[in-house]
Amino acid sequence: ATLPPTMEDLDIRQVAGTWHSMAMAASDISLLDSETAPLRVYVQELRPTPRDNLEIILRKRENHACIEGNIMAQRTEDPAVFMVDYQGEKKISVLDTDYTHYMFFCMEAPAPGTENGMMCQYLARTLKADNEVMEKFDRALQTLPVHIRIILDLTQGKEQCRV
């Protein structure tokens, strides 16, 4: 899959701390369509490791409960691209962040029958909805090599796994 343009000068230390999933987008609705869909994960915290890998603390729904888990994202030569082993090897790329308010990232997500599916999220430091950033996220999605659209707008806060 062709990867989206990323932040070439990402400073991994500055993304540390609490984040909230505000919106999820995907190239295929099946990736996110149910509460237990495999990529419907809610990011809680990013923890850079001493070796510049990134531990991602997240929650997802399993058997009607929210399960906390973590994924270790291994750094690559590109500071904004990480490899994770989550249902197979996948690339995560950071599209954009200002470190203090928002971060957009995408993960390769081959849906059944497609090679280059993708799931993207808009993360925010607080739960306060920001329409400007949401529009910016939407514009960022339009630059991607695959057709992708916002499927879940979480700014209304109805999701149970979102803290």
Swiss-Prot record:
Disulfide bond sites: 66-161, 106-120
A molecular-function term among this protein's GO annotations: retinol binding
Sorted UniProt keywords: Disulfide bond, Milk protein, Retinol-binding, Secreted, Transport
Signal peptide interval: none
Highest taxon of the lineage: Eukaryota
Cell location: Secreted
Pfam short name (any one): Lipocalin
Keyword field contains Cell inner membrane: no
GO cellular component: extracellular region
Gene3D superfamilies according to UniProt: 2.40.128.20
Function, as annotated: Lactoglobulin is the primary component of whey, it binds retinol and is probably involved in the transport of that molecule.
Subunit structure: Monomer.
Protein family per UniProt: Belongs to the calycin superfamily. Lipocalin family.
Protein name as it appears in the record: Beta-lactoglobulin-2
Species: Felis catus (Cat)
Lineage: Eukaryota, Metazoa, Chordata, Craniata, Vertebrata
Gene of this entry: LGB2
